[in-house]
Amino acid sequence: MHENERYAAGLQVRRAVLGNAHVDRSLAARTPFTEEFQEFITRTAWGTVWTREGLPRHTRSLLTLAMMVARGHDEEFKLHVRAARNNGVSADEIKEVLLQAAIYCGVPAANHAFALAAPILAEQAAEGGANAAD
């Protein structure tokens, strides 16, 4: 796949997973300093990895949540809680990931992740958003 095609495929997946509003904000916030990085993320993370057929997006979202907990990347974790819901991940599945993380990443990391995820899930349920019925 040509670089431009990979970018276009990545942008499509990035929008589907993260939502148009987030992607539009990220692209609008580009500067000459960050523009190449935004293109790199879209082309490589989204256009190369997230477009692969080896794992469904649902599974990729679960893995991403676990890795964000393990690395302590709070803002990305919150972003990917929303993204996981866009990929059909239920609140119960997110809870299971966090319980698993408690064992392998430590109780404090999981406790913090529960505190970050809870308001997002509650907000989505109140708005009738992604998978609100679970």
Each predicted region: which residue ranges?
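Substrate/cofactor-recognition hotspot
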Residues: 76, 100, 107-108
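Mid-chain, well-packed structural core segment of small domains
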Residues: 62-65, 69-95
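Short alpha-helical scaffolding segments that buttress acidic/His motifs in well-ordered protein cores
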Residues: 41-45, 62-67, 97-102, 113
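Gly/Ser/Thr-rich helix-start
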Residues: 20, 48, 67, 73, ...
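Short Asp/Glu-rich motifs
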Residues: 103-104, 121
